[in-house]
Curated annotation (Swiss-Prot):
Basic and acidic residues: bias regions: 346-356
Name of the gene: LMP1
Keyword field contains Lipid biosynthesis: no
Region (Disordered): 194-386
Lineage, highest ranks first: Viruses, Duplodnaviria, Heunggongvirae, Peploviricota, Herviviricetes
Region (CTAR2) location: 342-386
Name used for this protein in its record: Latent membrane protein 1
Biological-process GO terms, alphabetical: symbiont-mediated activation of host NF-kappaB cascade; symbiont-mediated suppression of host JAK-STAT cascade via inhibition of host TYK2 activity; symbiont-mediated suppression of host TRAF-mediated signal transduction; symbiont-mediated suppression of host type I interferon-mediated signaling pathway; symbiont-mediated transformation of host cell
Biased composition regions of type Low complexity, renumbered to the chain: 209-220, 251-267, 357-366
Extracellular-side positions: 45-51, 97-106, 161-163
GO cellular component term, pick one: membrane
Family membership noted in the UniProt record: Belongs to the herpesviridae LMP-1 family.
Compartment(s): Host cell membrane
Segments on the Cytoplasmic side according to the record's topology features: 2-23, 73-75, 128-139, 185-386
Annotated site location: Interaction with host TRAF3: P204, Q206, T208, D210
Length: 386
């Protein structure tokens, strides 16, 4: 299993959360039943306790909510259970403040204000949890308004001191926490499923590397290979480097003028396929072992279709090279090698007989304009095509 460089090595899988013990569930259900009975007794009795009746009923409702959270969602006891416990302590403090006087009353009021601030902080923390779980701004606003609406209704119930109003307020508090529990149950489960990390799947970086390697291999397989064979000890005429700056292949050691060199270098930094020429330099400042071309270039590559010139002082073959399966290597001449065309195809054969159709083809052509009197066809041009 590959290591995730961003996440680090995967840790051990967390064991599934087991259900709570049957004894704890039974005890919680028993306490929930007793709390409901006590709450109904206070609400339905004719006890004239005034505002204390409302506070006792509200305290029992908070106990009921805590028991429900413990039974169904124990993992939410920290945010929701702590909020209910803090509200329960504030309710008990209000019941105690109802009969206090003097400095104890002032101290109780300070504690009450401090408790209200804690309740507000816990509620904001709970809304942040809902936001992280994917709640929209409208859902958060609805929970926020429902919370403050219940507080206002509780204050009204303390003022009215009516049993039916107290029953309505307590049920609204229960509905608020049940709505939060249900929302966190569904959205929290979906959030955990979306962010579950499956180690069996490849990492995105690994998948990218695999695809790039595959594309590189495909591009390498798609490249055309030009098969050539050398004549004697001379370098080949054509190679895989088809991007030489001179417009043609670079078949030998490169000269300072970035031209092809199949033989010793001349003083004019041009291509030479044989020893230095004893003849004077041409006016085009280039080396010329044959008739001068009008394009001021070296005419040492594949020559125009001229007859063989045996009087060349350098020993070069002045005629055009034959692209056959053999090339004669005369003394001192490191002329161009042959092209292996896979079946004895000729360079001037426009039909490409015997050539492998999957390999690129090197054609010889002329510029179409005449040069010197000895070279009526102009320089030879090399064409590369698939």
């Amino acid at each position: 299993m590959d290591l995730d460089l961003e996440r680090g090595p995967p840790g051990p899988r967390r064991p599934p959360r087991g259900p709570p013990l049957s004894s704890s569930i039974g005890l919680a259900l028993l306490l929930l039943l007793l709390a409901l009975l006590f709450w109904l007794y206070i609400i339905m009795s004719n006890w004239t306790g005034g505002a204390l009746l409302v506070l006792y009923a509200f305290a029992l409702m908070l106990v009921i909510i805590i028991l429900i959270i413990f039974i169904f969602r124990r993992d939410l006891l920290c945010p929701l259970g702590a909020l209910c416990l803090l509200l329960l302590m504030i309710t008990l403090l209000l019941i105690a403040l109802w009969n206090l006087h003097g400095q104890a009353l002032y101290l109780g009021i300070v504690l009450f204000i401090f408790g209200c601030l804690l309740v507000l902080g816990l509620w904001i923390y709970l809304l942040e949890i809902l936001w992280r779980l994917g709640a929209t701004i409208w859902q958060l606003l609805a929970f926020f308004l429902a919370f403050f609406l219940d507080i206002i209704l509780l204050i009204i119930a303390l003022y009215l001191q009516q049993n039916w109003w107290t029953l309505l307020v307590d049920l609204l508090w229960l509905l608020l926490f049940l709505a939060i529990l249900i929302w966190m149950y569904y959205h929290g489960q979906r959030h955990s499923d979306e962010h579950h990390h499956d180690d069996s799947l490849p990492h995105p970086q690994q998948a990218t590397d695999d695809s790039s390697n595959q594309s590189d291999s495909n591009s390498n397989e798609g490249r055309h290979l030009l098969l050539v064979s050398g004549a004697g000890d001379g370098p080949p005429l054509c190679s895989q480097n088809l991007g030489a700056p001179g417009g043609g292949p670079n078949n030998g050691p490169q000269d300072p003028d970035n031209t092809d060199d199949n033989g010793p270098q001349d003083p004019d930094n041009t291509d030479d396929n044989g020893p230095h020429d004893p003849l004077p330099q041409d006016p085009d400042n280039t080396d010329d072992n044959g008739p001068q071309d009008p394009d001021n270039t070296d005419d040492n590559g594949p020559h125009d279709p001229l007859p063989h010139n045996p009087s060349d002082s350098a020993g070069n073959d002045g005629g055009p090279p034959q692209l056959t399966e053999e090339v004669e290597n005369k003394g001192g001449d490191q002329g161009p090698p042959l092209m292996t065309d896979g079946g004895g195809g000729h360079s001037h054969d426009s039909g490409h007989d015997g050539i492998d159709p999957h390999l690129p083809t090197l054609l010889l052509g002329t510029s179409g304009s005449g040069g010197d009197d000895d070279d009526p066809h102009g320089p030879v041009q090399l064409s590369y095509y698939d």
